[in-house]
A protein has these predicted regions:
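Cofactor-centric catalytic regions
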Residues: 1-71, 75-94, 107-249, 261-280, ...
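Extended, non-catalytic structural segments that build the interaction scaffolds
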Residues: 72-79, 294-314
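Generic long, charged, amphipathic alpha-helical segments
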Residues: 100-106, 280-304
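Extracellular/lumenal ectodomain signal focusing on beta-strand-rich modules
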Residues: 101, 211, 223-225, 260, ...
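C-terminal substrate/ligand-recognition segments
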Residues: 214, 259, 306-331
């Protein structure tokens, strides 16, 4: 379980919000106008990692090849999120060798074991734990073989291709292990008939602050700034993590302001991107990211996950900001100009 509270994330985010407002005010970006209304909104989230209340495990293999390179075989597909890179980093860190010495084969049913799907924000936490275990086993085995081969105790594997290739040849000739299996099952308990139980072994917590500017003539909503704060356990790869958060923020912006599947008599009437609108780079505002690290006792090196949590609070934080700016309650998304106009008209009639 996370060592951080949502309050920690909210407090850190609030500090960033105040700093950004002060900077924008000094630079003349917050000029008041009767036409435009601004406000911040915030929303928080927590998401369990893995398959809810079900068995969730991963098996991987790690091998020292005769070339001196290590080869990781993992079933989880890298669909662009960079998990192949993160898994190699975990293996390299546990082995104590440079990252470039680890190669990876992923999602090849002929060669890889079942490590589960790349869903449910589970790859880093569950598959990564299996990778760490495999690397630990292989490292121990290889250090023992190195002692037998050279007659001296080694505290670490030498990061040298020639030395590792010679060690691999020795292991082959003396029938020593060149491969290790890692497996990890997320701690959880099946849900009872009331739907209660320990559904997840770990949770990712996060908050998003969004500043909007609403045009009271056209009812168009522009998001001017976003601040995100997430507790991801230990950040294995901060650059990939930042990319995941930016992608989640952009998805949530589209979800909150423009994306809507329209049906008429069971037929989709906006099947093309001329009517099903998506955010572009011009729509995504500057994003200030804050990563507060803790250490999960089960995850690899204390890591958890960030994939889906990054997209969860965004639409709600934008809706809360619009609500604060226009003094209306947002109960439906996307927040189109037509819907916002109707809400303001209804409010004025009540008043």
């Amino acid at each position: 379980m996370s060592h951080l509270r949502l309050a920690d994330l909210l407090e850190e985010g609030q500090r960033r919000v105040e700093g950004l407002d002060a900077m924008d005010r000094d630079q003349g970006r917050l000029k008041e106008s009767p036409r435009f209304r601004r406000a911040w909104g915030v929303a928080a989230t927590h998401m369990g990692l893995g398959r809810t209340g079900l068995s969730d495990s991963a098996e991987v293999t790690l091998r020292l090849e005769e070339t001196g390179y290590f080869h990781l075989f993992i079933g989880c597909p890298d669909t662009g999120q960079g998990s192949d890179t993160s898994m190699c980093q975990i293996a390299a860190q546990e082995l104590g060798v440079p990252f470039y010495l680890v190669r990876v084969t992923s999602a090849d049913t002929l060669l890889t074991r079942d490590a589960g799907t790349s869903t449910a924000t589970r790859v880093t936490y569950i598959a990564g734990s299996a990778v760490q275990q495999a690397a630990s086993k292989l490292r121990t085995s290889l250090l023992s073989a190195a002692k037998e081969k050279e007659g001296i105790e080694h505290n670490a594997l030498l990061p040298d291709l020639g030395w590792l290739a010679n060690l691999a040849a020795f292991c082959r000739d003396h029938e020593r292990e060149l491969e290790a299996l890692g497996n990890f099952a997320a701690p959880s308990a099946a849900l009872d008939d009331q739907g209660q139980g320990d559904a997840y072994g770990a949770y990712t917590f996060g908050v998003q602050f969004s500043r909007v500017r609403v045009d009271s003539w056209t009812w168009k909503v522009d998001v001017e700034r976003i601040v995100t704060c997430f507790d991801v356990g230990r950040a294995i790869n901060p650059l990939l993590l930042a990319g995941q958060v930016e992608g989640g923020v952009a998805m949530a912006l589209g979800y909150g302001l423009m994306e809507e599947l329209l049906l008429q008599d069971g037929v989709v009437i906006n099947p093309n991107f001329d009517r099903y609108l998506l955010p572009t780079a011009a729509d995504v505002p500057p994003i200030t990211q804050v990563i507060l690290e803790s250490e999960d006792p089960e995850g690899p090196f204390g890591a958890k996950g960030i994939g889906e949590p990054s997209a969860i609070p965004g639409a709600a934080s934008i809706a809360n900001a619009v609500s604060a700016a226009m003094d209306v309650e947002i109960g439906e998304i996307p927040i189109t100009p037509e819907r916002l106009s109707a809400l303001v008209v209804a409010r004025n009639r009540r008043d």
